[in-house]
UniProtKB/Swiss-Prot annotation:
Alphabetized SUPFAM superfamilies for the sequence: PLP-dependent transferases
Pfam families named in the record: GDC-P
UniProt source species: Aquifex aeolicus (strain VF5)
Gene Ontology biological process: glycine decarboxylation via glycine cleavage system; nucleoside metabolic process
Disulfide bonds: none
Subunit details: The glycine cleavage system is composed of four proteins: P, T, L and H. In this organism, the P 'protein' is a heterodimer of two subunits.
Alphabetic keyword roster: Oxidoreductase
Upper lineage: Bacteria, Pseudomonadati, Aquificota, Aquificia, Aquificales
Entry's transmembrane regions: none
Molecular function (Gene Ontology), one example: glycine dehydrogenase (decarboxylating) activity
Protein name as catalogued: Probable glycine dehydrogenase (decarboxylating) subunit 1
Length: 439
């Protein structure tokens, strides 16, 4: 057992002083028949396997089986994350307003910002936003400020429809035209249509999702080249887990990268609280919304963390402020930080690869049951499938506490009888096979 403090040399020294030759001699006074011959311990289990055992033992706590994503994903959360976050130092303090306050909290936020930059490939990240949707909307406003002129915002129709709705809400006070670029048979943004829009309109912001709402990997290289050609600020909404196996948007010329951090250590919780992350290029930092923690030195030359470039309406004239966000999601951001630190690059890559391999298996078996592909593009762990009897299948599985994806006709009229299915590393082969057995 690795936690016994005595080394082999120390054990020999103690036995020598006691006049004994072995540990067995130390217990020679105990009758041999009292010694256990075989403990019959089961094989060791992971934390997640133990959690499932206890859940099954408590019948009243049986949870639905989720194969639904669309921006919120049922992933494994190491229990140590919320053990740490439950400490009073993290759980109860309010976000520090004074620049010098709470060095521990400020350092934690600084470390979070650093890892978000590493994940996205960008130069600077802020202390977090309310959620992914508000981060995207703020990114569009920032892109408008970067461009300085124009009257059109372009959104891919393959971008999460709820996020698009949030952007439209934020833009209600402006006189912008919002153009939604359609998707192709591959399930990705139509590049020909996009170039026509960029050519014919005064565009001051373009936003796409990577991978997109349907789970397909957008051609960021080509989109980035179009943005550079027509001098349009490029906003990319990303999946943080996907970035462990995909090239970061920074390599394709993204000006602003945002995303939803729920997948990294935050439970589903009826839709919140979540956390949005926000990163950009160094040259745009003065137009970035939200709080920003920097590292410097105090008057004694010691390292000190402080809030910097505070351009909220509480600090400067309202009309010159970059945002009016009143607080950040500091506790949720720390959950993201702990998740990234605990899993590391390789751990997050394993999460992504497991999710992808299970998704491919489930998709292949579902297609044997009469489901059909809707698009031809390359996806990760989320994909849409069509079935003529989808509503009947959906109702049947709901009775068994199984949620088979999100019906897409709620958002897209041309996607009748289509469901958007997501498979995470949390789903086991036994669970997947149990669903297939019901079809």
């Amino acid at each position: 057992m690795s936690y016994i403090p005595h080394s082999e040399e120390e054990t020999k020294e103690i036995l020598s002083k006691l006049g004994l030759e072995s540990l067995e001699d130390l217990f020679s006074h105990i009758p041999k028949e009292l010694f256990a011959k075989d403990f019959s311990f089961p094989e060791p289990k992971s934390e997640e396997e133990l959690r499932r055992i206890f859940e099954r033992a408590c019948e009243d706590t049986e949870l639905p089986l989720y194969f639904i994503g669309a921006g919120a994903y049922d992933r494994i959360i190491p229990s140590v994350i919320w053990q740490i976050l439950s400490r009073g130092e993290f759980l109860t303090p309010y976000t520090p307003y004074q620049a010098e306050a709470s060095q521990g909290t400020l350092q934690a936020i600084f470390e979070y910002q650093s890892l978000i930059c590493e994940l996205t490939g960008m130069d600077v990240a802020n202390a977090s936003m309310y959620d992914g949707a508000s981060a995207l909307a703020e990114a569009v406003l920032m892109a408008r400020a970067i461009k300085g002129k124009g009257d059109t915002v372009v959104l891919s129709k393959a971008l999460n429809p709820l996020y698009r709705r949030t952007v439209k809400t934020y833009l209600r006070g402006y006189e912008d035209k919002i153009v939604e670029v359609p998707y192709t048979e591959e399930g990705t943004t139509d590049l020909n249509n996009l170039e026509e829009v960029l050519k014919e309109s005064e565009v001051h912001a373009l936003a796409v999702q990577y991978p997109n709402f349907f789970g397909f990997v957008e051609p960021l290289k080509e989109i980035g080249e179009l943005c550079k050609k027509y001098e349009v600020p490029f906003v990319v909404f990303v999946d943080p887990i996907a970035l462990s196996i995909l090239k970061p948007p920074a390599e394709f010329g993204a000006d602003i990268v945002v995303g939803e951090g729920q997948q990294m250590g935050i439970p589903l919780s009826f839709g919140g609280p979540y956390v949005g992350f926000f990163a950009t290029k160094k040259e745009h930092v003065r137009k970035m919304p939200g709080r920003l923690v920097g590292m410097g030195e105090d008057i004694e030359g010691k390292r000190a963390f402080t809030l910097v470039l505070q351009t909220r309406e509480q600090h400067i004239r309202r009309e010159r402020a970059t945002s009016n966000i009143c607080t950040n999601q500091n506790l949720m951001a720390l959950a993201n930080l702990l998740y990234m630190v605990l899993l590391g690059k390789e751990g997050m890559k394993k999460v992504a690869v497991q999710s992808l391999s299970k998704a491919l298996y489930f998709k292949k078996e579902l297609m044997k049951k009469g489901f059909e592909e809707v698009f031809t593009g390359k996806h990760l762990w989320e994909f849409p499938l069509r079935h003529e009897s989808l509503k009947a299948i959906y109702r049947k599985l709901l009775k068994e506490k199984i949620v088979l994806g999100l019906p897409l006709d709620r958002f897209y009229e041309d996607l009748k009888n289509t469901t958007l299915i997501a498979v995470t590393e949390k789903r086991t082969k036994e669970e997947i096979d149990s669903v297939l057995a019901l079809l």
